[in-house]
Amino acid sequence: MATNLLCLSNKLSSPTPTPSTRFPQSKNFITQKTSLANPKPWRVICATSSQFTQITEHNSRRSANYQPNLWNFEFLQSLENDLKVEKLEEKATKLEEEVRCMINRVDTQPLSLLELIDDVQRLGLTYKFEKDIIKALENIVLLDENKKNKSDLHATALSFRLLRQHGFEVSQDVFERFKDKEGGFSGELKGDVQGLLSLYEASYLGFEGENLLEEARTFSITHLKNNLKEGINTKVAEQVSHALELPYHQRLHRLEARWFLDKYEPKEPHHQLLLELAKLDFNMVQTLHQKELQDLSRWWTEMGLASKLDFVRDRLMEVYFWALGMAPDPQFGECRKAVTKMFGLVTIIDDVYDVYGTLDELQLFTDAVERWDVNAINTLPDYMKLCFLALYNTVNDTSYSILKEKGHNNLSYLTKSWRELCKAFLQEAKWSNNKIIPAFSKYLENASVSSSGVALLAPSYFSVCQQQEDISDHALRSLTDFHGLVRSSCVIFRLCNDLATSAAELERGETTNSIISYMHENDGTSEEQAREELRKLIDAEWKKMNRERVSDSTLLPKAFMEIAVNMARVSHCTYQYGDGLGRPDYATENRIKLLLIDPFPINQLMYV
């Protein structure tokens, strides 16, 4: 099978030549130095960039035939939410205090409190009540030591999941009591849909080697599917189907909150306050996100790369959606802006390496990034000059903003992430150009870097660390040496991408992705078998991340760990039904509308 796939790859490796574009020669570059009047790192502008026009090049170049941008500048600038924000903020503040009192009530039964915390979390309000939730969970742990009422599968599984999600060390052995004499899970649980669903969700918080949780997952999936076949309540069936498609732990939580807002039914009358707060908060945070998106669309349009280079993806909206997925909470605006800018450039430069550039040109560009010297532009072809200057200016500006706001000297870490990224891009280009299929382990080692994850996580780390003393050597080593939580998140990013994009890459003549490498190395393996092995690898990386999040030796800031985990989640989301970045489909468009365009329907007259 691998041989046949390689033959197919060779047939497709020389696509029909398509016209492409280049730019007329321009030598008018101006360098801005750091000074009291201009206190930024070296920044270079192109004095005549507005004079560049697209012209057809006679030399043949490949094209990925990306679909046009769905969201133009005028549309993004027209986004306007008519919320009466001041009035809504007043109401939200009052509701927030009432919900806080609900969480902190000492007479609430443990299960009711756990369900309330789960609702708060699923409705996207964790960031408002983080300290209250931790305190409540600590009290539940203490209570649990004295009251061994653990016969309820739903209560046990929900407690286990929430505790692990929030960094508590809790043993998988809490599920031993639900086993029968033969060592399997008791048959009496087969009809407990609520308990099975909670057990299923809890099983995705497992660590490597926790076989009991693997058994729990298999058992719960089997009997949840059986219950669906036999027929259960329509609303419950919808929840079960939704969970079986992708567990909550791996879902994009901001998007999940929007889904849950439509489904939530308060368990008690006073929980209506929680729903009301969640609706208001969703819309107010959406307004903030829209304003950020408009600012970034002006930056993107002014930079002009997507309009000048017709072979690249013009995907600002999708890139901002990714940044929002990594850092959704309102206080992380600077992080979202930095990630959007870095990822926007990643998509452009990735297309230069994957689609357009010759090997000689790509080597020159890689050398220029390695030097990080503006004079290196003299060695580059015109289209690469714009790419390099855009990268040089944006990274320097991002570094300057972080230095100004947080006092972190971070430029060397940001530039290192780009040096490593471009070298990984170049390696893939060499493999593809020479029709080499690397060993799977060698491919994955390089591909986890070429995922671009570190280029996104590096500015994220410095953006969320509030003070210079928050910077730890351990965290910096994770970024520079590429290990632990950072590596796992990047591997998941890459494998999710490969599962979705391998067919299109094969059509372009590329032979370097994980599916092809795995099939080539394991002769006789079918494509579906290779895909299943990649899914197992993704699951293994999730278990590593789960372990590190509760490890006493972890010195990474909690906010950064959540952002790294969120990068894995947004990878699942973006590539769940296909290539949501390269070829956005209806699902991608609908998700963007839910989070960034359409507010949740509320009656504002209630708050006037």
Swiss-Prot record:
Keywords: Chloroplast, Lyase, Magnesium, Metal-binding, Plastid, Transit peptide. A motif (DDXXD motif) lies at residues 350-354. Mg(2+) 3 binds at residues 497, 501, 505. Mg(2+) 1 binds at residues 350, 354. Mg(2+) 2 binds at residues 350, 354. CDD domains: Terpene_cyclase_plant_C1. Signal peptide: none annotated. It is an enzyme of class 4 (lyase). Its main location: plastid. Binds 3 Mg(2+) or Mn(2+) ions per subunit. One of its GO terms (biological process) is diterpenoid biosynthetic process. It is found in: Plastid, Chloroplast. The keyword Cell membrane does not apply. InterPro entries: Isoprenoid_synthase_dom_sf, Terpene_cyclase-like_1_C, Terpene_cyclase_plant_C1, Terpene_synth_N, Terpene_synth_N_sf, Terpene_synthase-like, Terpene_synthase_metal-bd, Terpenoid_cyclase/PrenylTrfase. It catalyses: dimethylallyl diphosphate = isoprene + diphosphate. Its EC number is 4.2.3.27. Gene3D superfamilies: Farnesyl Diphosphate Synthase, Terpene synthase, N-terminal domain. Dimethylallyl diphosphate binds at residues 350, 428, 494, 497. Residues 1-45 form a transit peptide. Sufficient to confer the trait of isoprene emission when expressed in Arabidopsis. The Asp-Asp-Xaa-Xaa-Asp/Glu (DDXXD/E) motif is important for the catalytic activity, presumably through binding to Mg(2+). This is Isoprene synthase, chloroplastic.
